[in-house]
Amino acid sequence: MPPRAPLLCFVLAGSLLSSGAIAADASAPPDDACALAARPLRAPDLQVPFDIVDGRIYLQVQVNGRGPFRFAVDTGASGIGRADTRLATALDLPLHGQATTSDGVSSASVQVVRIDSLALGAVVRRDVEVITRDYNAHNAPEAAFMGILGRGFFDDGLLVIDYPRRMLSFSRTQQLPTQGTNVLRYERAFRVPVRIGGEQVLGQLDTGANVRFVLPRAMYDTVSAGPLEAAGRSRLTNSQVEAQRATVQGPIEIGQLRLADVEVRVSAKYPELLIGAHALQQAVVLIDQRTRAVAICR
């Protein structure tokens, strides 16, 4: 089982869209990745509304033909998905060994269960093995979920997360180009180019993290001279880290998204820049793992 990237929980911290609801952007050049965000996908395999709680995406999933169950969509999670212990118990999911998971700071041994079918609308994954653990121990009741859809669930098509319209779409017949305007290529999922002021860095796109940004302390010192305030301990999947709070003047630019005067978390322990869900609420996020490309559109 591949390691799991952090699902951050900082403790101290719709209706269906009709096919004609988004007007096509006739001014966009043919190789502009954001042209796909400006018009409805042609005959998508999937188009479903989602809810947002504390920045995170929640939608309804069928497990072994039962449900629906509330799942989160987490691009920071490797593999097909995760099962909360409540789901594993309710469905009597069979144990299938153990795995090691990492949150970027520390590792832990976890149990694995087997699921016969995991279905989001017409998109179905069969005979999958997923990590199971208590994912809700530190969640508020309104943020509780029964499982997670990881990036592997969407690895054979184009995933479109339209935050303003709260709509998730998926297509195997359309794809992001490998180069062109607004194309963000990545080598390691999903580390994309980010510009902070005059600095060009890589940031991990993580829809499961209920923050705007997390910066390693060394990176923060190169992009801002602003003061830091204590923010207590921030909880990762396997561990906790001391965090501080600051405002980065920026601008912070990711694709078409441009943010200024952004509150961020800073930690000397965290290994890389993290782009969390709260930074993406005004964006349309497109991810195509077949072409290893991402687009962040407005």
Regions found by a protein language model. Give the residues of each.
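Bacterial N-terminal signal peptides
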Residues: 9-19
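Bacterial N-terminal signal peptides that target proteins for export
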Residues: 1-10
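Pepsin/retropepsin-fold aspartyl endopeptidases
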Residues: 22-298
